[in-house]
Amino acid sequence: YSCICNQGLRVLESPLKREGNTYVVDWDDFEAKCADKKTTLFLLCNPHNPAGRVWTKDELARMNEICMRHDVKVISDEIHCELIMPGYVFTPFATVNADCQRNSVVFNSPTKNFNIAGLQIANIICADKEWYRRIDRAINIFEVCDVNPFGPLALEAAYNESEDWINELMPYIADNYALLKDTFAKEVPSYEVLKLEGTYL
């Protein structure tokens, strides 16, 4: 959170709570934190890193309803969006409904999904014209938009020509997760491996 703190702002966390072998939103705490008059942005990790949750459409809609009730904008980090375990479906925040689209800024990148982090390429998706203007100004002031010349080419190739990569990668990750669960169950049964819905962390 250094980029937040370096601007003289404060991070206010709303921890997830354990429920069975997964984590869920503590809705009472989340609403209370959004109701804080100093809260202006909600940073969402979708899917969640490191809890491995793939948020449902209903959960995302509820998050946004609470945020809008308290005039809080949603920043949705969707960098792990392609890394979804079999049986789960990723829902982009801005596609949930029109309010979610209007009240969000989405950050995405092929870097995690396609192992190209060194090329430093990402996307910012924003429907709100005023927020778009502010973001464009900020990334130019802080010089974070200097593009690696290979980045755009890699991004296009990842999104347009790499479906086979993801189709082969996810069963591999699922097998590794199954191996991890099995190994812990046999060798360290006192440790529980939580359900993994998405990401590889």
Annotated model-derived regions:
Residues 16-88:
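Active-site phosphate-binding strand-loop segment of PLP-dependent enzymes
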Residues 9, 69-73, 101-102:
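A short helix->loop->beta-strand "cap" motif at the edges of active sites that frequently abuts
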Residues 1-11:
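Substrate-binding/gating loop at the entrance of the active-site cleft, primarily
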Residues 133-140, 158-181:
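Structural signature of PLP-dependent enzymes
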Residues 149-152, 156, 171-181, 192-201:
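Conserved glycine-rich beta-strand-loop-beta hairpin in the small C-terminal domain of fold type I
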Residues 120, 146-169:
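Structural motif of enzymes handling amino- and sulfur-group chemistry
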Residues 96-134:
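Active-site PLP attachment segment
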